[in-house]
C-alpha cells in the first residue's frame, strides 16, 4: 500500500497542462519539446499531461496541413513520442493532424507507456472570423467504434473513447478539442455523463483582448456543470504570428474552482500542475443524483480503454490550495462577501419567523461569549429591519457559579449599547436549591463539579428563558452554533440545545468571530457597540460552569472537545463530502501541519496562528468521530428550526443531515486506527 502521505492513496491525482514552444510545420522539433516537458511531468509524479491542439505540427500552418511531407513527418514524430513514452508514467494527450479514410482530422492522441491508447477527432470545426478549419479538416462528430492505423498498429478511433486507469480509482479521462468546449452541447458533457472525471481540452485559440477571461469562464463552468476536473492547454510561443498572436494559456479547474493556472505569453515552456480530488468528484456525483439522471435517455455508448498508471507510492506533497478554515476563506474579498451573506441569511430568517408568527418580542440569554453576542446582534438587526424597537429585545444575563466578572460586564455593556431591555437573574440560589433537593454532593457543601452540576445551571437558564417568553408573549432565540451541535456540546431538552428559533444553528464557531469582525468593520451598529464587540472577541471560549481558583485559567471548552479550528475542519469534510477519516487526516496535515505555509484569514490574531502535527490531528479527529457519530445525534434529531447558512452543510434533521440517533462510531474509528499512523 502507498505511504499515508502519498496523495494517490487518498483519491487524488496530479495532472499537468503544458505548453511547449511551437515550430511551425516541423514535427520533429515539436516532438522533442513535447518529450522534454513530458519527462518533467513524469518527474513531478503527474498522471496526465495535456498539450495544445495540433502541437505536433503547430496550429497555424494553414495549407501546409495538406502537404504530404508535413503529414508524413507528423506520423514519424508520433512514432517517436510513442516509443519514448514507454518509460514515462503520465498519459500524454497531444494534438496532431491525421489522415483517416479520404479526409484529414484534427486529432487528440492519448499515448501511454509505448502505445497509442486511442485517438479522438475534433467534432466542431470553427469556420468564422479568423478560423477556417473546414478548409483542411473533416468533423469527427459521430465517428464511433472505428480504428486508425498508426505506426503499423491499429488504435481505437472516434469520439466515443474514455481512458480509465485500472489502479487509480475514479481516474477516467475524456478528451475534447478547443471549439468542442464552446458549443451548447459539448462532447465533454457527454463524456462526463458516461463516466469521465477528467476532461482534457487541447486548444489552439489565438489570443485577443478578453478571450482569456472567456476561456476561464467556460472551463470553470464546464468543470462545475460536469462535476469534473478540466485541464486546458492552449498554443503559445512559436506559433506563426502572420495575422494572430498566442498566449499559451494553461489552467486546471475542478468543480467550479480554479486550482492552478500558468503564466501567459511565456517565452519558455510551461508546465502547470495541480492535484485533483477524484474522490471529491465521485462523492459529488454520488450525492447529486440529478447528475446521473441527466444522462438517461441519451445515447451515451462509450468504449473504455484501460491502462495501468503505477502511481508513485511516496510523499509528493499536495499541489492544491487548502483552506485551514473551510468555512472561512482566506481571501479578504471572498470572506467579506461570505460574511455579508451569512449575516443577512440569519437576519432574514429570524425576521421572517417573527413576521409569520406575529411575534413582536424576543427573549435571549446573553453570556458575554461569542455565540450569544452574535445571536444578539442578529436579533437587533432583524428588529431594525422590521421597524420594531430594540426595547422589544428582552435580554437576560444569568450568572452562575463560574461566571466571570469580565464576561458579565461585557454582556451588560453590549445589552446597554444596543438599547435592549436588559436584566440580570442570578441562578446560583435556584441551582443550589435544586442540587440540595437532589441530594447532590454540592448541596452538602462538597466541591463536586460533575456533569449534573453543570447541567443544572444550563437547564435553569433555559427554563427561565422559556418562562419569561411565556410571560411576555415572546419567543426564545437559540444561540448555540453548528460546531457545538456537531460535537454535542450542549445540554439536551431543558438546556441550550432547545429554543424557539436557533439563529446560529447553521454557523460554525470558526466563522462567528469573523462575522463579528465584519459587523464591526462595516459599521452595522454604533461605535460603542463595536468597542464592546471587540472586547468580547478577546475572551477565552468557555462554558463558565465550573468554578476555578483565583488566578487560575477558566474552564476551557477546547481543552475537552478539541480545537474548534480542527473540529470545524473535520466537520466540513465529513458533512459536505462524506470523506473517510484517513483522508480527512491527510487533508488536515497539509492544511495545519505548517503555520508558516499558506494564507490565513484576514485579521486572524498572530499569537493564535499555530500548527498541529499528525498525532494531534489523529487524537482530535477520534474525539470528533466518537462525539459526532456515536454520541450526539439524538440532540440533533430534536433540533429547533434555524436557517442553513453555509454551503458546507447544516445539521437539521429536516435538511442536510438525517441520521439514526442510535448509530455507532465504530466503523469510522476503525478506519482511523487502521489507516492513519500514530506518528
Question: Which residue ranges define each predicted feature?
Answer:
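Enzyme catalytic cores with a strong preference for nitrogen-chemistry domains
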Residues: 1-365, 381-390, 422
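ATP/NTP-dependent adenylation/nucleotidyl-transfer catalytic domains that generate, transfer
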Residues: 30, 169-171, 226-228, 237-240, ...
